[in-house]
Amino acid sequence: MQNYSKSEKAFKEAKKVLPGGVNSPVRAFNSVDASPVFMDHGKGAYITDVDGNEYIDYVLSWGPLILGHADPAVVNAITKAALKGTSFGTPTEIETELAKLVIERVPSIEIVRMVSSGTEATMSAIRLARGYTKREKILKFEGSYHGHGDSLLIKAGSGVATLGLPDSPGVTKGLAADTITVPYNDIEGAELAFQKYGEEIAAVIVEPVAGNMGVVPPIDGFLEGLRELTTKFGSLLIFDEVMTGFRVDYYSAQGYYVVTPDLTCLGKVIGGGLPVGAYGGKKEIMEQIAPAGSIYQAGTLSGNPLAMNAGFETVRQLTPQHYDVFRTLIKRMEEGLTEISARRQVPLSINKAGSMFGFFFTDQKVINFDTAKTSNLEFFRNYYREMLGQGIFLPPSQFEGVFISTMHTEKEIDKTLEAFDTTCKILRG
């Protein structure tokens, strides 16, 4: 039995000064009927809470830590940079070096602008698309989360889905009217939207692998169909690769699926665990951004040297071979979960993409937000608490992706499968 007394005390204090006791809603553990676990430190594939409980970590700070916790080279890069000064508000050479690395690895990006979060990246890309096309409407997909920008919270996933909110109060009717939504993986729905609004649509923004309703890969022809539609109607195709960038493949999801968007949004991995975002794409589009062009975007800490050094050192270390290992480990996890769930008579549907995967307690194949919502949420809540008690730290929401790092091995996968078997035995009797 795990002891969480220090975490409970810390949460009680946090609620006095933070809304709901946290700085991001899903961290409150409300959807799993538990109090949040306060972490103290991490190393490799493991994380340890303030009570001294150690866990195999499948959250990895919600995706950024693809090299695991406290990677020595990343920590060293941050330390050396901090000793020189934490921020200057001027250009630094490391910004250019990280930009070159991103351009080398992400097929669609010819020029890139660094920002401070994934939300800032998607908001800026949307503004750029509207300014470039002189149009106002945006098409997005139900259950996809593109950050907390107002126009992108319409029928969103991630924490919005976790809380069961269709939209967020505070989003104006005008913004909602300019946001068109269709189900993810529904190319026919997208075609109908373009038939009705085609000349008004500035851009389609899509996660090439939806990671905020669980993990939902694109069906055959979906991304290709969006590329054809946007080209036909003169709209821009924006890939939100904040989560999938450098997680699905060495060349990101667009490289794996061989579909090239006009603009790409990045975050998470390219900051190595520090706040960062980026958006980039075709030179002719990106040069519309100030000071080269008239579409404004700026940021006090954009391209700050700590995040740039952490991101550069993270991306630099990744090799194509890492992704072969990721797929082998995820396959081992999938096969184990499938065997155990069948033996324990627990309905289970599994999706995977590179170093991320998702599982749903349902008999249905999960291809969009509606099918994701068929998962047995009551079973998930009980399952989550049992797994946590056995030292497995998973996202405290059915609608979040699960991640592995270069520090996860067969040992961690097998321990997780043992815990899953024990949990299913307890819950199924």
UniProtKB/Swiss-Prot annotation:
Recorded catalytic activity of this chain's protein: (S)-4-amino-5-oxopentanoate = 5-aminolevulinate
Chain positions with N6-(pyridoxal phosphate)lysine modification: K268
Cofactor requirements of the protein: pyridoxal 5'-phosphate
EC code: 5.4.3.8
Subunit structure: Homodimer.
NCBIfam families: hemL, PRK00062.1
Family label: Belongs to the class-III pyridoxal-phosphate-dependent aminotransferase family. HemL subfamily.
Protein name: Glutamate-1-semialdehyde 2,1-aminomutase 1
Species name: Listeria monocytogenes serotype 4b (strain CLIP80459)
The encoding gene: hemL1
